[in-house]
Amino acid sequence: MGFYMNEQIKRFNLLMSEIDTAYHEAALKLGMSDSTMLVLYTLCSYGGECMLGDITSGASKQTVNSALRKLESEGIVYLEAFEGRKKKVYLTEKGRLFAKDTAFRVIEIENEIFALWSDEEKSIYIDLTQRYLADFKEKVKEL
């Protein structure tokens, strides 16, 4: 059985993998795991507090919970009950300083890159990525 993959898909997959690797390298350079970076990055993107579900979407709950427990024990974050069984995650003051020196630096890099792109380029990139994701999810349902 011969396998065929469109050359553009190969390139796309390689680029996606290289982007993941670049974020992993950023986390390592900043002295943290990918899961810790995910938690801090998400908290930064929500202004220092968010629902636990905002962090766990797109990641393993077990991995996120391990990172949260570690960050909580270090005084970086704290969790509070919110509307029944939901939980909200907050950066402490120490956490805000830590996030500013770590995850926020990655956000600044992203902002610098996007600032170099025209509004049209940003819209095209986001729209096509969103469309690809939606189409891919639909096809996965058919598996």
Where are these regions (language model features)?
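C-terminal regulatory/oligomerization modules of transcriptional regulators
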Residues: 1-2, 120-143
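Residues within the helices of the helix-turn-helix
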Residues: 51-53, 69, 87
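N-terminal helix-turn-helix DNA-binding core of bacterial DNA-binding proteins
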Residues: 21-63
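Charged, amphipathic alpha-helical coiled-coil/dimerization segments
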Residues: 72-127
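DNA-binding alpha-helical recognition surfaces that contact promoter or target DNA
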Residues: 41, 66, 127
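N-terminal leader segment of winged-helix/HTH proteins
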Residues: 1-30, 76
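Pre-recognition alpha-helix immediately N-terminal to the DNA-recognition helix
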Residues: 11, 18, 22, 38-42, ...
